[in-house]
Structures are given as structure tokens and as C-alpha cells.
A protein has these predicted regions:
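Short, conserved catalytic or interaction motifs in soluble domains
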Residues: 145
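Portal/gating segments that form or line small-molecule/metal binding sites
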Residues: 1-142, 152-193
Length: 193
């Protein structure tokens, strides 16, 4: 069965974004970029919420035509174009990503629909949703691997990752590593025993 792998950056005080969705505090460098791009080999699909999808589409669809795009950006844009894009939204009517042949819109029955997708052949699925969607997926026990990058920054306020989670989620540490930037990468799986 395919796994859902969540990659989320957190501030030291537990925020996944600033109060206005700012992400400029992430200590993103070449080393973190390479770590994120390693997920390309493991995954062939991505899950987004509506707002994340809209932001990704507005940026990544322009990358191939932008002469200032870096090789890493071009590689990620190609991966996104080839990947199945799964968008969870009650308000979207359709997904417009190039020819949209590899898109799935989930409007209801999230757990049932995601579990159907996990049963289909393919590589693992990269979860890049918002904090609200992440909390929903955590509540429904849909995330199979948590990759949490703790950044050496205290935001003081913002969008907390775990605020809407009301159940205990025991985790087993699979790996931890420290990057030169001071980011500590933690990789967990739910301890479902």
C-alpha cells in the first residue's frame, strides 16, 4: 500500500507558517533543497488543500517559461507536472493544471477517498497541505510518515501545526539529522500497534 509522507517545516515554537502564511523564516538552503528533492524518487503524487494548490499553481506553472529559474526549480516543476495532483476542497469545481489529466479533486469523504488512492498502484504520496488540512489528516490517521524540519527560529505567533489535533498520536522515531543551517530533520511513523 502507498504511504502518505508529510513534509512540514516548523519554527522552534511549533508554527508551520507566520500569521499571514509567511514562510520566509524557513532556513532553506541547498542542503534542505536536496533533502526535499530526494522525495521525488519516492513519490509520484502530491496532496494539497485549495489554498496551497492555488499558490503552487500560480508559481510552479510559470517556472518552465522563466529564464531565471534554477535547475532545481525546473526539476521540481517537471516533477509536479508529472505527479498526480490530489486537491482536497469543498469549494473548487475543477483543477486547472496544464491538461489536468493527472488531477484528483476530493470534495467529501476524505478518509474513504484517500484510502482508495493509497490502494492504487504507484509510489508514495507527498502531503504538502495547509495546517488545517494536516490537522484533518492527523485526526483521520491518514499520514503514514511525518517529516518535520524544526527551524532555528521562534516566531512567537502564526499557524500552529497541532492546534486542531484532539487525539493522541504515538510516534516512532525513524531518523534524525541536523543540517548546517541549524535545521533538525525528524522522521517519524505512527506507532499504530
Amino acid at each position: 500500500m502507498r504511504k502518505i509522507i508529510s513534509l512540514i517545516h516548523l519554527s522552534l515554537d511549533g508554527f508551520a507558517a507566520g500569521p499571514n502564511d509567511e514562510l520566509d523564516w524557513i532556513a532553506y538552503d541547498e542542503e534542505l533543497e536536496q533533502d526535499a528533492h530526494a522525495l521525488h524518487a519516492l513519490t509520484d503524487a502530491v496532496i494539497w488543500g485549495r489554498r496551497t494548490y492555488e499558490g503552487m499553481a500560480s508559481y510552479w506553472l510559470t517556472v518552465p517559461g522563466n529564464p531565471a529559474s534554477t535547475p532545481a526549480e525546473l526539476a521540481h516543476a517537471r516533477w509536479l507536472d508529472d505527479a498526480t495532483k490530489i486537491v482536497v476542497s469543498r469549494t473548487l469545481e475543477r483543477i486547472d493544471w496544464n491538461d489536468a489529466h493527472n488531477t484528483v479533486l476530493i470534495k467529501e469523504n476524505i478518509a474513504e477517498e484517500i484510502n482508495k488512492i493509497k490502494q492504487q498502484p504507484g509510489k508514495d504520496i507527498w502531503f504538502l497541505g495547509s495546517t488545517m488540512l494536516a490537522q484533518t489528516f492527523m485526526q483521520l490517521d491518514l499520514i503514514d510518515e511525518y517529516r518535520i524540519n524544526i527551524n532555528p527560529t521562534v516566531l512567537g505567533r502564526g499557524k500552529p501545526l497541532f492546534a486542531g489535533v484532539t487525539r493522541e498520536i504515538p510516534l516512532k522515531l525513524l531518523e534524525s539529522k541536523t543540517f548546517k543551517s541549524g535545521v533538525v530533520a525528524l522522521r517519524y511513523e505512527p506507532n499504530r500497534t
